[in-house]
């Protein structure tokens, strides 16, 4: 009876993302820090270390970017008060941001961008994932 719930979801559908971190770390021309998935190379199964960087254009690293995110959810409780001269209302709440993301994308976050409008649809490496945060609060009205 005294509870309230609000949530916000965001999503995008029908687009592709270039998974640049996978393309970089699965590159068989570098000898360091390679992913095990390099064994599934898109270049005809060449698993050996090569000194020449492959300049072939392939769609191997294009992935479906569809996602649905729980951007925010808040659950609150209005604490019933007996008549008080000073306090009119007290509400306690808990809130979560970026609680979950439903996606088939292999990267960190299908919504990531480096802020450059010319590189939309490219997930650049060396990015931090979106933070997940939890907030507990108390609203008091006088």
Indicate where each model-derived feature is located.
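Hydrophobic, lipid-facing positions within transmembrane beta-strands of outer-membrane proteins
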Residues: 1, 70-75, 132-138
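Repeated loop/turn-to-beta-strand initiation elements of outer-membrane beta-barrel proteins
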Residues: 2-5, 82-83
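Glycine-centered flexibility motif
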Residues: 3, 14, 76, 121-122, ...
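Transmembrane beta-strands of outer-membrane beta-barrel proteins
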Residues: 5-7, 90-94, 136
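Short helix/loop capping segments that flank catalytic or ligand/cofactor-binding pockets
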Residues: 6-8, 15-17, 103
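Extracytoplasmic gating/loop element in the C-terminal half of outer-membrane beta-barrel translocons
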Residues: 12-91, 95-99
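C-terminal beta-signal and terminal closure region of outer-membrane beta-barrel proteins
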Residues: 52-55, 103-142
């Amino acid at each position: 009876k005294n509870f309230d719930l609000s949530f916000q979801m965001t999503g995008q559908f029908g687009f592709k993302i270039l998974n640049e971190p996978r393309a970089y770390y699965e590159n068989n021309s570098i000898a360091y820090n390679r992913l095990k998935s390099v064994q599934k190379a898109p270049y005809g199964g060449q698993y050996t270390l090569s000194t020449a960087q492959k300049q072939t254009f392939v769609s191997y690293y294009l992935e479906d970017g569809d996602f649905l995110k729980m951007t925010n959810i808040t659950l609150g409780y209005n604490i019933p008060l007996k008549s008080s001269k000073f306090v009119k209302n007290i509400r306690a709440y808990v809130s979560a941001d970026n609680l979950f993301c439903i996606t088939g994308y292999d990267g960190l976050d299908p919504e990531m961008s480096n802020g450059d409008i010319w590189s939309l649809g490219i997930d650049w490496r060396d990015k931090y994932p979106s933070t997940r945060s939890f907030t507990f609060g108390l609203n008091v009205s006088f």
